[in-house]
């Protein structure tokens, strides 16, 4: 049996391709699953950094003694009190259903589906804007500029997520960039396919570096061969037809 290509081994998901658990908080940074009708308060007891995550996390302790980790908003500090519930005040760090958030309010860490604990607008320094309320749901303007309509019961955190500008900091060495990608389980550096051996990549091998075949492959190409221009509508330079 021949040796499997690297792309197939990555698809299998072995330990060498997964992000390490070292430096993790040990639990997901989601909203605690409180009933929607209940009102809870928690105190920020610590601000922690999780490996592979640019935005800091707030360690929150509630009145019943339970502890949860949630993404920290810009300006959060130890000792502050966060409110979770429908009757929470419109202040930074509080978690409220978007049906009770006024139009024009800046929010982050929004639930895509009710009860998922926050799934969108979770990157460092990002925020969204509650645009309007309607019969179909609440319309939110995302950081990309697109609009999405969500369930009014979905929860969101008031404010802008902390850690903005972290992605603008330049990498001073290739090793620093490698460690950053390693913590996130991403591949770095990326080697060109034509520079690899024939058994490693479909574009590899030969007396000189060339693809040797069409670089466009179909959408249903099996793993290992699915490299190059995947389901491309057109490739190459655009030709401008001269008008007669």
UniProtKB/Swiss-Prot annotation:
Q: Which InterPro entries match?
A: NA-bd_OB-fold, Rib_uL2_dom2, Ribosomal_uL2, Ribosomal_uL2_arc_euk, Ribosomal_uL2_C, Ribosomal_uL2_dom3, Ribosomal_uL2_RNA-bd_dom, Translation_prot_SH3-like_sf
Question: Which Gene3D superfamilies does the record match to this protein?
Answer: 2.30.30.30, Nucleic acid-binding proteins, Ribosomal protein L2, domain 3
Share an example GO biological-process annotation for this protein: cytoplasmic translation
Instruction: List compositional bias (Basic residues) regions by residue number.
Output: 1-12, 234-244
Q: Kindly list the GO CC terms recorded for this protein.
A: cytosolic large ribosomal subunit
One Pfam entry name = Ribosomal_L2_C
Q: Which UniProt keywords apply?
A: Ribonucleoprotein, Ribosomal protein, RNA-binding, rRNA-binding
* Family, as annotated: Belongs to the universal ribosomal protein uL2 family.
HAMAP family xref list: Ribosomal_uL2_A
Official protein name in the record? Large ribosomal subunit protein uL2
What does the UniProt function comment say about this protein? One of the primary rRNA binding proteins. Required for association of the 30S and 50S subunits to form the 70S ribosome, for tRNA binding and peptide bond formation. It has been suggested to have peptidyltransferase activity; this is somewhat controversial. Makes several contacts with the 16S rRNA in the 70S ribosome.
Residue ranges for the region (Disordered) are: 1-30, 203-244
